[in-house]
């Protein structure tokens, strides 16, 4: 069940939802969510000597992103067909019985700006700023400014508190304070250590019908 503005205010009061900094927060609470603002740090992608990025080889991603920090009154230009990692100005903390969902804003969508490619869910127990996968689907560059409303968070109540909230184990993005690049290599390292993708193991997982 998605929380209403009344429920969101109650959870902010109880501490189950925390948003910092909180100045002007009341004005950004909508009927079913909270508007979040754009931070000042961006990761832009650049071509390098690597032919492609290999999720099994962390070195293949070295030099593919460059960090840009801008002043609060400076614009950041998102060019057509460009992918940029950015983060919310606010740090969000949610309890073990709530799930957060990052949504785009219609006003920016009509300019071609999307705020995530796949990562919209923030699991129970999440704590940190939210990394956004900003993209420009339009034909014109678009200027974005730190502090502007960039996305909205909605919240859903779980059927019960989760047993293993995000952060109870080693989670690569927990506690982030700015945009972070992909951590897919950590996942593959864990899988390889467990033997899930090791050559000759679990061959039946990839077997085709009729293979013996």
Predicted regions and their residues:
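DUTPase catalytic domain/fold
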Residues: 1-212
């Amino acid at each position: 069940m998605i929380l209403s503005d009344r429920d969101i205010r109650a959870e902010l009061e109880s501490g189950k939802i925390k948003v910092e900094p909180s100045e002007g927060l009341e004005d950004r609470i909508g009927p079913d969510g909270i508007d979040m603002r754009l931070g000042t740090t961006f990761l832009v992608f650049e071509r390098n000597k690597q032919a492609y990025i290999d999720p099994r080889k962390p070195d293949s991603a070295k030099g593919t992103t460059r960090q840009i920090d801008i002043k609060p009154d400076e614009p950041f230009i998102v060019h057509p067909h460009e992918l940029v990692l950015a983060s919310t100005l606010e740090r969000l903390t949610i309890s073990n019985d709530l799930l957060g969902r990052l949504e785009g804003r219609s006003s920016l969508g009509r300019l071609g700006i999307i705020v995530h490619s796949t990562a919209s869910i923030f699991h129970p127990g999440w704590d940190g700023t939210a990394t956004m996968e900003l993209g420009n689907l339009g034909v014109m560059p678009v200027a974005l400014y730190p502090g502007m409303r960039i996305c909205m968070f909605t919240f859903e109540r779980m059927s019960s508190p989760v047993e293993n909230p995000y952060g109870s184990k080693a989670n690569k993005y927990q506690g982030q304070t700015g945009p972070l690049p992909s951590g897919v290599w950590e996942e593959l390292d864990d899988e390889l250590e467990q033997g899930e993708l090791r050559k000759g193991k679990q061959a039946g997982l990839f077997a085709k019908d009729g293979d013996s």
